[in-house]
Amino acid sequence: MKQTSKKKELKTQFNYNRLWKLLIDRGIQKQELQKMSEVSAASIAKMGRCENVTTDVLLRMCEALDCTIEDIMQRVPIKDAAKAE
């Protein structure tokens, strides 16, 4: 009999509140970021919902904004994801 394994439930996730703060501090609109980084509006919308995006998207944003990954995202407990920084 084949046994199926259940994945362990995640306790943390990434959020992008640091990105939104960085954009505000620099006076950059999301549409401008989209053009600067050549990232789709759908990817930016996913980030707004704390959903997964590809590492390519993250690298493009870091290059466009001349910043590090830590400047735009952080790992937080799932229960606190919406309110972190």
PLM regions with names:
Residues 23, 34, 48, 62:
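The alpha-helix within a helix-turn-helix
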Residues 39-53:
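Recognition helix of helix-turn-helix/homeodomain-like DNA-binding domains
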Residues 50-63:
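Short, basic-rich loop-to-helix N-cap that marks the start of a DNA-contacting helix
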Residues 1-29:
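A short, Lys/Arg-rich alpha-helix, primarily the initiator
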Residues 32, 43, 57, 71:
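Residues in the helix-turn-helix
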Residues 24, 38, 49, 77:
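Residue-level detection of the helix-turn-helix DNA-binding "recognition helix"
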Residues 66-81:
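Short C-terminal boundary/hinge segments that cap the last helix of small helical domains
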